[in-house]
Amino acid sequence: MTEHEQKYAVRVTPSDKIRFRCTLCGACCRNVKETVPVDCKDAFYLTKHLRDLGMDIYCVDQLLEQYAEPALLDECGFFVYFLKSVGEDNACIFLKDNRCSVQEAKPLACRLYPFMVDPNGSGSFSYLYSTERTHHFRGAVVETRSWMKKHFSQESRAFMQAEYTQAGPIAALLMRIPEHRKTEAVLHFHRLRYSELDLDKPFLEQYQRNQMKLLAILSRMAEEG
């Protein structure tokens, strides 16, 4: 969860209910500079979606170059991507005519809105919702559990737990790698988390395999010094 999300987050239980109605105002797609994360799973499905629509995009690296921007999460070299924002109102780059142009493949953060999830380390999740845009909280009653069942897939759950479990070890290894090899390590990080994803094969299997490769490479580099 980003610092921006934490600022407006209110914790809820699976059985809690809130009022929520999408008004198609586009407000949640504006003023989003560096607030919409695009993890490797999001990037995989966005790339596949745009390719299948006939756009000239055939790999995750192309998507990231055109539609996302990197942000350093830690000085060790661990970085993430956020969707680019455009215009004076810092609107999401995929907002067209006040509508999401990638609705079928939008990032998990957008899919879960107004809710958010936070892995708790025990294999389950804590749930929160964002109070940032108060005019959204009217209309029909929405139960947390039902919303998650609809929008938080088993694949997303498995991926998020793996990210939570492995981020620490990866960051620790990056910290141990000497400065003169840091660029090499970061290139491996990007290659195995983003570049080496085949759009025509299942995501999760590739992700898990690549993560193991990355941990092995970084571990060897840390030992070699």
Language-model features and meaning:
Residues 1-225:
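Short loop/turn segments that flank or connect secondary-structure elements
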